[in-house]
């Protein structure tokens, strides 16, 4: 272990230019490249790299309309959010408004179903 500690100390004392030269020497000695694999893939064959669409993992549930039965919707909003009666009423009356933000897809679908069962209209975004 003392040898490893000495190597770490020696490497830590290198300048940037010395570290770059060491990197080149190790690449030649071991026959490897420090280049990023993405750069190698983009250079090969002239193929256009496809943009990978990131799958959305967090969703917002938006109350778009309270509907005719606002009392049931207010009760459901209170149950979902844990808000007090006044805060839930204000949220329902201010529609369109986010009821819950940054939730999983399954939870967002469940909340939307509960709101719609109470008579409201909701969207998941």
Swiss-Prot record:
It comes from the Bacteria. One of its GO terms (cellular component) is cytosolic large ribosomal subunit. GO terms for biological process: translation. InterPro entries: Ribosomal_bL12, Ribosomal_bL12_C, Ribosomal_bL12_C/ClpS-like, Ribosomal_bL12_oligo, Ribosomal_bL12_oligo_N_sf. One of its GO terms (molecular function) is mRNA binding. The keyword rRNA-binding does not apply. Keywords: Ribonucleoprotein, Ribosomal protein. Belongs to the bacterial ribosomal protein bL12 family. Forms part of the ribosomal stalk which helps the ribosome interact with GTP-bound translation factors. Is thus essential for accurate translation. Homodimer. Part of the ribosomal stalk of the 50S ribosomal subunit. Forms a multimeric L10(L12)X complex, where L10 forms an elongated spine to which 2 to 4 L12 dimers bind in a sequential fashion. Binds GTP-bound translation factors. NCBIfam families: L12. This is Large ribosomal subunit protein bL12. It comes from Rhizobium rhizogenes (strain K84 / ATCC BAA-868). The gene is rplL.
């Amino acid at each position: 272990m003392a040898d490893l500690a000495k190597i770490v100390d020696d490497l830590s004392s290198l300048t940037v230019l010395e570290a770059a030269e060491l990197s080149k020497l190790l690449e030649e000695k071991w026959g490897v490249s420090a280049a990023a694999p993405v750069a190698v893939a983009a250079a090969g064959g002239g193929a256009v790299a496809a943009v990978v669409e990131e799958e959305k993992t967090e969703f917002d549930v938006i109350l778009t309309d309270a509907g005719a039965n606002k009392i049931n919707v207010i009760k459901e909003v209170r149950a979902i959010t844990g808000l007090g009666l006044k805060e839930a009423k204000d949220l329902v009356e201010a529609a369109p408004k986010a009821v819950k933000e940054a939730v999983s897809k399954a939870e967002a679908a469940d909340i939307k179903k509960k709101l719609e069962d109470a008579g409201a209209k909701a969207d998941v975004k």
